[in-house]
Amino acid sequence: MASRSAGTLLTEFNAAYVPPGLMPGYQGHVPTVAFSFGAPYGTTTLKYFQDHRNRAMEKSHTPFSQGGHFPTIFSTNPNLLLMERASTRDRWLHKPSYTRFNLDSHRSTELTNFYQMVQQHRKYYQDKTGTVPRVPYFAMPVREPERYPLPTVLPPLCPKKKWHLLRLAPENLKTYQTFPSGKRVSPQERKKRDCYFEFRA
């Protein structure tokens, strides 16, 4: 049987004959899209999707539309930011209840924790009373000797403490013994006497 796709169809009209190498294959069918000979199925459906998406995005920018006003944390519109909303119990009404499942859970947890720390830090530097604690994640680093001081490096002493230390120093202690007669005996002489009189019966 003669077939056009196999190239065995014989016709006497040259305009009706299409070579098999130039004959397009199955291009699919989109009911709502007008079919054009030069556009394949993938290009036609992609253009249909992009047109539909662009129309929806343009409509969502108007304040009278039903969609497009979803609360978010990153937006060029300050009215959509979660931080700009009222800090009352109504903020839980605007909290997004949807999640995306195509994300890395570990990275999403890190970003969520970082965002919470950012909000706490923002409350800290906006606080005028000094009652909000500082977030240690955003503390500026200090030099190592200041953060880990050596135990031998002591702060400067006040004159009162210095006087007490000098008074209790070994070289300032009384190391001699005073007898009732007024004679003073050095510890070396006492040691010799103890060695001698230790064995005395």
From Swiss-Prot:
It holds the Pfam family CMI2B-like. InterPro entries: CIMIP2C, CMI2A-C-like_dom. GO terms for biological process: flagellated sperm motility. Keywords: Cell projection, Cilium, Cytoplasm, Cytoskeleton, Flagellum. Its main location: cytoplasm. Microtubule inner protein (MIP) part of the dynein-decorated doublet microtubules (DMTs) in cilia axoneme, which is required for motile cilia beating. Binds to the intra-tubulin interfaces. This is Ciliary microtubule inner protein 2C.
